[in-house]
């Protein structure tokens, strides 16, 4: 089978390389290309949808603000009452302002469609609603500040009055001890007693949890032991005295009594006349002389 050789010659007349002078390949993307008219139509539809959404949002926000203002005016306890102004009740001055704004409007452009502008009437309604909300917030803030000031003043007055009363009652309270409150005295135990007390408390708490014994308990376990402890002599700090300490105390008491008897015996008595003693002095001689005639009369 004969083979044909294909050769390419350079065409220098056109000034373009022959290798690069091929027709464009069909990649299949031509059907997905969109014309400029279709793009403009899509952008215009998108801008219209966004404008409608913005208008709906502004209307909903205005209605919410008016409802909030009405609720705040109902809840306010002050004398000043704020009324919600409907958006269709506009004065003549406001209409004049709207005309002046239509003649010289402030240009507000959107991002997608810069030729569209906001509605001046809509902007006026938004400004009215914002002014009402600002007034309401100012009134509420003033009321809160006044309430806070009054509460602070009352608290300061109460604190000063309480401090003055405490200063007046302190010196009396320091000297007077209420009889209803008993004085807590410390008690001393050795190591064996200490561990025994802990063991007893643990067992009692366990029984109280199981509701086997009542939680109300006496300050002592056994009445006889309590009486015996109350009779025992105590030393410094409420500690019980030992037998040696008790014997020494008895010896000191006996020595004190011996010294008193020795002084009474050996110190001479003062010679004091009865006239120098206080009180009326009775004369025994006169009493005897009075008794004699009575005896004579009785004998006669």
Curated annotation (Swiss-Prot):
SMART domains: CBF. The keyword Membrane does not apply. The keyword Iron-sulfur does not apply. Keywords: Activator, DNA-binding, Nucleus, Transcription, Transcription regulation. Binds to the upstream activation site (UAS) of the CYC1 gene and other genes involved in mitochondrial electron transport and activates their expression. Recognizes the sequence CCAAT. GO terms for molecular function: DNA binding; DNA-binding transcription factor activity. This is Transcriptional activator HAP2. Belongs to a heterotrimeric CCAAT-binding complex. A motif (Subunit association domain (SAD)) lies at residues 188-211. The gene is HAP2. It comes from the Eukaryota. Residues 36-68, 284-300 have a biased composition (Basic and acidic residues). It holds the Pfam family CBFB_NFYA. Residues 218-243 bind DNA. Residues 69-80 have a biased composition (Polar residues). GO terms for cellular component: CCAAT-binding factor complex. It is found in: Nucleus. Belongs to the NFYA/HAP2 subunit family. InterPro entries: CCAAT-binding_factor_CS (IPR018362), NFYA (IPR001289). Disulfide bonds: none annotated. Its main location: nucleus. Transmembrane segments: none annotated.
């Amino acid at each position: 089978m004969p083979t044909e050789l294909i050769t390419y010659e350079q065409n220098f007349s056109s000034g373009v390389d022959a290798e690069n002078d091929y027709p464009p390949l069909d990649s299949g993307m031509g059907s997905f290309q969109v014309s400029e008219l279709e793009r403009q139509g899509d952008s215009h539809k998108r801008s219209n949808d966004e404008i409608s959404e913005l208008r709906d949002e502004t209307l909903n926000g205005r209605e919410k603000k008016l409802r909030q203002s009405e609720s705040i005016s109902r809840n306010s306890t002050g004398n000043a009452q704020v009324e919600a102004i409907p958006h269709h009740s506009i004065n003549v001055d406001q209409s004049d302002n709207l005309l002046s704004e239509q003649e010289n409007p402030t240009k507000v452009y959107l991002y997608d469609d810069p030729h569209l502008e906001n509605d001046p009437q809509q902007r006026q309604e938004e400004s009215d609603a914002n002014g009402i909300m600002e007034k309401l917030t100012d009134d509420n803030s003033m009321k809160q500040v006044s309430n806070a000031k009054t509460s602070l003043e009352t608290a300061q007055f109460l604190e000063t009055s309480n401090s003055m009363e405490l200063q007046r009652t302190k010196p009396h309270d320091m000297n007077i001890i209420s009889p209803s409150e008993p004085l807590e005295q410390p008690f001393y135990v050795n190591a064996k007693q200490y561990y025994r007390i802990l063991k007893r408390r643990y067992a009692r708490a366990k029984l109280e949890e199981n509701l086997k014994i009542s939680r109300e308990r006496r300050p002592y376990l056994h009445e006889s032991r309590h009486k015996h402890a109350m009779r025992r002599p105590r030393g410094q700090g409420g500690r019980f005295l030992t037998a040696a300490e008790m014997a020494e105390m008895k010896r000191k008491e006996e020595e004190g009594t011996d010294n008193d008897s020795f002084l009474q015996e050996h110190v001479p008595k003062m010679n004091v006349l009865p006239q120098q003693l206080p009180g009326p002095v009775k004369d025994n001689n006169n009493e005897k002389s009075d008794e004699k005639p009575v005896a004579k009369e009785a004998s006669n």
